[in-house]
Amino acid sequence: METSRIAIAALALSASGLVYIAQREGYSEQAYPDPVHGTKVPTAGFGTTGPDVKMGTTLPPVRALVRLRADASEKEVALKRCIGDVLLYPREWDAFVALGYNTGTAPVCLNNERSGPSTIVRRLQAGDHKGACDAILLYDRAGPVIKPQDRCSHPDNRTCRGVWADRQRLRAMCLGEPTP
């Protein structure tokens, strides 16, 4: 039986949420070019980016785990600020933090087309938790979408099917369903 939802201010990414991110991102001791942005966004460890990560940077396993936790904590702070005072299950929080870790928090917080809060934020603030979890599936791209086939959810897309599979797993996690 699931416990009650908890105030977002009291939530922290769970150990299983952190392990999920680590497994999804994979580990690389040597910095590599980001799959979407190339060498403009060098990535090392468990998906770590930032001004201190350059091509040639090495991040040994222990440092990479410490950095993963610190990076995830930064995402949590940003998400708490944009989502506001809502109640969530820990599994919902884990899913939104994992999404923000992968996409960056700006897309999870804001809708640039509407100049306002994202669908996830609007639905959470309205108390529509299922709708907010379903909205994870809206993050179905890696890079710009020029034509429908560019969406990772499109059956003809062969370049980012892993992104779509991840979004389906995050939605299931958020809803407390078995992960596909």
PLM regions and their residue ranges:
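Long, amphipathic alpha-helical surface segments
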Residues: M1-A9, S16-T39, D52-V53, L59-A70, ...
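Active-site nucleophile-His-acid catalytic modules used for acyl/amide transfer and hydrolysis
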Residues: E74-S115
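Solvent-exposed coil/turn segments that connect beta secondary-structure elements
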Residues: G47-T49, Y101
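Alpha-helical scaffolds flanking conserved acidic
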Residues: L11-L18, L88-V97, G131
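Small-residue-enriched, tightly packed secondary-structure blocks
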Residues: T39-F46, P61, K75, W93, ...
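Flexible, active-site-adjacent loop/turn segments at secondary-structure boundaries
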Residues: Q30, P42-A44, V86, L99, ...
